[in-house]
Amino acid sequence: KCNPKNSKCVNGIRYVPINVVDLAGLVPGAHEGKGLGNKFLDSVRTADVLIQVIDVSGTTDLEGNPIENADPAEEIRFLEKEINEWFTDILLKNWTKIKGKNIDSVHSILTGLNISPEVVDHLADELSLPKTRITWSEDEVRKFAYKIRERSLLILIAANKIDLPNAREKFDKLVKEFPNRTILSVYADGELALRKANEKGLVKYNSGALDFEMLANVSEGQRSALNKIAKILKENKGSGVQETLNAAAFRQLELITVFPVSDENKFADNFGNILPDAILVRRGTTALAFAAKIHTDLAKSFLYAIDAKKKIRIAKDYVLKDGDVIKIVSAAK
């Protein structure tokens, strides 16, 4: 049995923590500074992926006001447009630093957005834009900015309120309308209710599970409410909350889970804790890069690593796999 330090293990399921930030809401014209647009867009700079929570039932407008039969597709298009225009504005406002120069000048303007020179270069080629003595038109700048957004900022859609009338029909329509987007149906109210009930000892529930167990101390009123939640959970194949986080981490960002240990025979740290840490890294991460993530000194004095499952030595350029248990061996100081 594992003894997690940086995460938790519930009924054999390892839950690895990630940083989730609740961003300020957007209103139309956010890229021009309206509302809290600047605060939101500044936060986007450091995000690996965005989860856009929309009202799939169509009972609120773009500013969160109650309304009847709104089109949830408008929410998706609205956010995409605002971020696209924000990327465009960044380039246009700095155009004097780009005009007449080469593609490196474009990358220098976009460095705060974690966009590599290779991506900038590739997208310019994809759009057949000149990369020396740049004189792109405003339309070409806009097309380039849109491509940059598509490549650098992943947006996943959490279609919430799936339990309300007409929501399922609207959800199915969204999936057809945006075939290239990741859209998940979410029942956040149900997830919250079950987590609270679990804390109070009324149910046994693991986040992400398709059902739950009611315990003996549940009142008739609580049983009735929980039965309704169970019905929706079954129809939706879960609440969708954990599934959304999993999709963001594993599908969008292509993360894998790797377990560092000090004792490759017992899968433990120096204190005997079994699989104490679970670390999320990008698919394609090497043993050396993993060592650097644990501590920079480990990477500097890296000798080799050990695959604890196979009991074999692995080199610094070994590409890690999901579920690997790894010991890093470094030179003694």
Specify the residue positions occupied by each region the protein language model found.
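Conserved nucleotide-binding/hydrolysis micro-motifs of P-loop NTPases
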Residues: 25-27, 55-61, 69-73, 84-85, ...
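Single-stranded RNA-binding surfaces
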Residues: 68-78, 86-109
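Secondary-structure transition/capping residues
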Residues: 51, 61, 90, 94, ...
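Structural signature of the urease/amidohydrolase superfamily beta/alpha-barrel
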Residues: 48, 324-326
